[in-house]
Amino acid sequence: MALDFLSTDCPLGIVSDIISNVNTIKEYGYSSELSTTLAPRPSREQVLEYITRVVDKLKPLCRVDERLYIACGELVHLRIKARNTDLKYWLKSSEIDLSDVVEQAILEHIDFVQKTLNSFETSEYRDLCSLGLQSALKYEEMYLAKMRGGRLESMGQFFLRLATTATHYTMEQPAMARVLVSGEVGWTYIFRAFFTALAGQVVIPATPIMLFGGRDCGSMASCYLLNPRVTDMNSAIPALMEEVGPILCNRGGIGLSLQRFNTPPTEGCSRGVMALLKLLDSMTMAINSDGERPTGVCVYFEPWHADIRAILNMRGMLARDETVRCDNIFACMWTPDLFFDRYQRYVDGESGIMWTLFDDTASHLCHMYGNDFTREYERLERCGFGIDAIPIQDMAFIIVRSAVMTGSPFLMFKDACNRHYHFDMRQRGAIMGSNLCTEIIQHADETQNGVCNLASINLPKCLALPPPNIAGVPYFDFAALGRAAATATIFVNAMMCASTYPTVKSQKGVEENRSLGLGIQGLHTTFLMLDLDMASPEAHQLNKQIAERLLLNSMKASATLCKLGMQPFKGFEDSKYSRGELPFDAYPNVTLTNRNAWRRLRTDIKQYGLYNSQFVAYMPTVSSSQVTESSEGFSPVYTNLFSKVTATGEVLRPNVLLMRTIRSIFPQECARLQALSTLEAAKWSVVGAFGDLPVGHPLSKFKTAFEYDQTMLINMCADRAAFVDQSQSMSLFITEPADGKLPASRIMNLLVHAYKRGLKTGMYYCKIKKATNNGVFVGGDLVCTSCSL
């Protein structure tokens, strides 16, 4: 069957485009690299082989010529086209497995759909093709569905199934349709709104939505938070089999609170919680062994757990032997304020500051936070219930050493997460953990799981140019961001309705909370396109304004749903929202740029309610940023030359904006190549290559995450925290000193600063750039992608 399709003649239009593209590459001066020729009437298979040979030959040269990087991406899109099939075959493909309602909706509007796809080929698709090689490969290898005979879903069909799914479930709720479009509400208007936002890469769905949207396979939720009542192996096994296993098999990322499994090793149970962690590790590895999307688990513990030292030593070289090594799962410290208060006392010079560990006799501490936690913890210490006591600086060192050497634990601030939740958790029992990537804050218990559905706004698509007759530079269009936020709100709500969920407890969590996780990607790219250094006051101001507008328009859309007759989320009457409180009210010194809009929204929420309980979560966008060629999430770029190993080999992704700037500064080819040689010798660091350039120099803004002051990056997270009602997956980027000795105090000082600034996530990954690093950041190094969009 594969031979039948691939052996057919490739459409002449595709062959013509390939020849045109190759001729353009030759005009760049790369004729010698293109010695192979394409047969006069090639088959599809011959076209695939030819493009693969050409791209493989040119890939290494992308590091010195951004034009090749773009051209290779265009060639890969032509390779994709050579594998595309017609709409009729796609609709009936058993591998695509479209849901009945999606297939029926397409057939009912087939003329409009075909017209939309034809328009896409000559408009949005041209822009997509010119993004670059990594974007094209990511679509080809991961997101476009495979069919028998070597066929591949087309880009238009990919966006079609997502837009149709969202349209169908939006049309089932007239209020959702009315929020999405003004004026006439009809299927074609709703479809066009979704298709335009998706194909234009303004709204970027999470990876599960891109993989499974519109299909009768998989779940579209990204994040699951579990807090089963697990106290020993007897209660742990059912939790693993009934909740963890099904979610992992559906490719969901899991945050799992296990603090209550806190019986220290005894003769009857010689390994304590480590036996459970080893089982969980093996389960995760087994499920990932045959999946197209790796998944993961992060286990949450508080630092007073009896086995905390063993937990912190479970990965990599720190594990004493294979029986306790757990390299397939992560850990996160769910840290109370008291820990950092005591560490600060040590830093201030006070001696003898200890940290006490407790077993399950203190399990009730899990349900407490703030002053209540502190009082009870200290009472238990005075009463002698502790099983061990460690100098606070030693405990801090163990945490930091593990993070630096193994990439785990992450660290979150328990009290801040509970303090800023939309319910008063003092009456409900404290939140005990987050998700896999530390950006989702939801209450979970033995009756329901926390579940979050994600999407991000591609910020570079919110830039606009002045009218043609007016001189000026690009500017950030807040109206475009507002429209994108509202569209994303309706889109994710529609996908929430469309999705199935792996377990009953997960379904209940979705139905009762309707939690959205809207984030951003391309923040650093946006600054660069606006000619702003990330450290500039203008960038810091824009950073806050973006977060404010995202929250405002998402909440406004959700409140309007209730205003139009939909019911608020369960428990709204008991939430802070019902009292007119908004997320930023709990933060000091917040300046609003949309004060009147917030005042009107506050009134509407009190009167009508909110359809969703949560809105904004700044997630990592490791995977989806590859298809947009934007910087990941809210982080600066890691390097100016990114290396990504894919199914087709290594791909070098240059910083295209930097490369274009260098080309404009050095128009002579010999001077440009010399500048790139200098940059490569300096490990792709502009500062290392050209020194401290004056402010305003075209190259001065191209710093990497490792070159920025980490305190400043933490401050940027804190500046927008008032408008992020969930949390932010904030990583630290540390450069190792030349002598290779990295003091733990350097990282602890950053964690203390994050704590003092009131963040909820103190550290997602701690990324270390070794003194011997060549400046090429390798994708996959200690990076979890399962819930990273």
Curated annotation (Swiss-Prot):
Annotated site (Important for electron transfer): Y764, Y765
Binding positions (substrate): T207, S222, C223, G253, N435, L436, C437, T438, E439, P620, T621, V622, S623, S624
Entry keyword Ribonucleoprotein: no
Gene Ontology terms: biological process: deoxyribonucleotide biosynthetic process; DNA replication; release from viral latency
Keywords of this entry: ATP-binding, Disulfide bond, DNA replication, Early protein, Nucleotide-binding, Oxidoreductase, Viral latency, Viral reactivation from latency
Reaction catalysed by this enzyme: a 2'-deoxyribonucleoside 5'-diphosphate + [thioredoxin]-disulfide + H2O = a ribonucleoside 5'-diphosphate + [thioredoxin]-dithiol
Disulfide bonds: C223-C452
Pfam families documented for this protein: Ribonuc_red_lgC, Ribonuc_red_lgN
Active site, UniProt feature: N435 (proton acceptor), C437 (cysteine radical intermediate), E439 (proton acceptor)
Sites annotated Important for hydrogen atom transfer: C223, C452
Annotated site residues (Interacts with thioredoxin/glutaredoxin) in this chain: C784, C787
Top EC group: oxidoreductase
EC number assigned by the record: 1.17.4.1
Entry keyword annotation includes Oxidoreductase: yes
SUPFAM superfamilies referenced in this protein's UniProt entry, alphabetically: PFL-like glycyl radical enzymes (SSF51998)
InterPro entries referenced in this protein's UniProt entry, alphabetically: HSV_RIR1, NrdE_NrdA_C, RNR_lg_C, RNR_lsu_N, Rrm1
Function: Ribonucleoside-diphosphate reductase holoenzyme provides the precursors necessary for viral DNA synthesis. Allows virus growth in non-dividing cells, as well as reactivation from latency in infected hosts. Catalyzes the biosynthesis of deoxyribonucleotides from the corresponding ribonucleotides.
Family, similarity comment: Belongs to the ribonucleoside diphosphate reductase large chain family.
Subunit field text: Heterotetramer composed of a homodimer of the large subunit (R1) and a homodimer of the small subunit (R2). Larger multisubunit protein complex are also active, composed of (R1)n(R2)n.
Annotated protein name in UniProt: Ribonucleoside-diphosphate reductase large subunit
